[in-house]
Structures are given as structure tokens and as C-alpha cells.
Amino acid sequence: MKSISGLIAFSALMVTSMSVSASEIRVMSGGAPKEVFAQLAPKFEQQTGNKVVFVYDVLTALREKIAAGEKVDVLVMPVPMLDGYVKEGKLRADSQATFGTVGTNVVVKEGAPRPDISTKEKFRAAMLAARSVVHATPGKTPSGTHMGKVMEQLGIADAMAKKVIHRPALEGGVQLVADGQADIGIYPASEVANVKGIAVVGSLPAGIDLNTLYGGATTADTPAGDAAAAFVKFMAAPENRSVWKQSGFDPPGS
């Protein structure tokens, strides 16, 4: 009887200990790594007992949240932005890790003709021939800002003004292509890698392509210090590289 009572007491102590040591980790991220985190976060939670809460938004909105003092334990965004926050003292440099590089893909509705986008000139012709094109809003995401510049560079900004729909992938932009409401979509490869109803034509051609290096780091004042750092380290671990690759990210430095 004593042994049973002792076992119950020990089990209760272990549960209490785990609940005390477990942390809730709040992660703010742009939309590009969302598919990766959906696959890897449950594995991290199972292995560590920690809970991860994600806040996804376009990068300009994330900047606004940070400026307003919204509390967060980990930031995931393009590395140049992380570097800026490290210099400002808002992120811990020793926790920073790179996750991978994501290119920018052109997509059409599944079964639709695939335009030739092999060169800048052919991409330009494909844009002009399209009934409608959707990409993220310039100024709000790296790909949206880039596409605004590309339209100017190709001299078709005015011609495309009435054709272009500005909608981030997080707000259903890719789905407009799947539903046939837009002929062409242009988004980070990771945001179109596993979407049903669309087909990837290819990446933007040389001269107007965009590759964005993503990484993560813990905030300087996070109360979940070790747990938050463990999350970043886990996501950058070599054994998880295949998940990043399947979701459209190439290894850092590739």
C-alpha cells in the first residue's frame, strides 16, 4: 500500500515539475515559413513539453506590433530585418539562426495553360497577356515590394494597374488563382508549395528574381529564454532540413 501511495505521489510530483518547467513560446512570423512550422511545431512541443503560439502577419504589420511593444519571445523574418533588431538591442545575437532561402514562384490554376516565363521579356509578355495577376501588396511584404519594382522595371506598371490584385498569401491571395479569379499568382515558393488547385510554372527569371533568406532569434527580454532559444535551434537543426526543403526553402548559403 505504501509503495502504491509512493508511486502516486512521485507521479504527481513529476506532472507538477513538468508543468512548472514547460513554457509557452510566442512566435511572431511572416507568412513564408507557416507551412514548415505547421509540420515541425507539434514535434517540438512533443519533445519539450513547451507550447508554441504563432502570430502570423505581413512584415509591415509585425514591425508595427513590435514598435507598439507587443510581447513576443521569438521573431522569424528575413535576416536583414533580424540583424536590424539585433543592432537595436531587441534581439539576442547569440540566439540567431538562419533557416533557409525562399525563391519567388509564378503559379496558375491547375490545368490552365502555363505561360513561358523563361526570360524577362517572356515574363513581361505573359503579364500583359494575363487577364488578371495577383501578388502581395507592395510595401507590406518582400515579394509584394519586389513585384511593384519589377512592373516599373519592365515598363508595364501603368498597363498592369487595372489587372493587378494586391493580396498577401496570408489573406487568401493564392486561393484567388485556385478559384480562377486570377490568371497568374506570384508568391514566395513556400506559400504555394502545397496549395491544392494550382500549378507552379516556375521561379521568376534571371534579372528579376527574388530570393529571401529567413531566420529567427529570441527577443532580449523574453521570459521564456531557454525554451525560446531551443525553439530557434530546433527549427534550424539539420534533421529538420528536409521539411524546409519540401516547403520551398533551400538551405542557407545555397
Where are these regions (language model features)?
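Bacterial N-terminal signal peptides that target proteins for export
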Residues: 1-8
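Cleavable N-terminal signal peptides
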Residues: 9-10, 20
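Extracytoplasmic catalytic/substrate-binding loops of multi-pass membrane glycan-assembly enzymes
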Residues: 13
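N-terminal signal peptide c-region/cleavage motif recognized by signal peptidases
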Residues: 16-18
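Exported/periplasmic ABC-transporter solute-binding proteins
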Residues: 22-60, 64-71, 79-102, 108-254
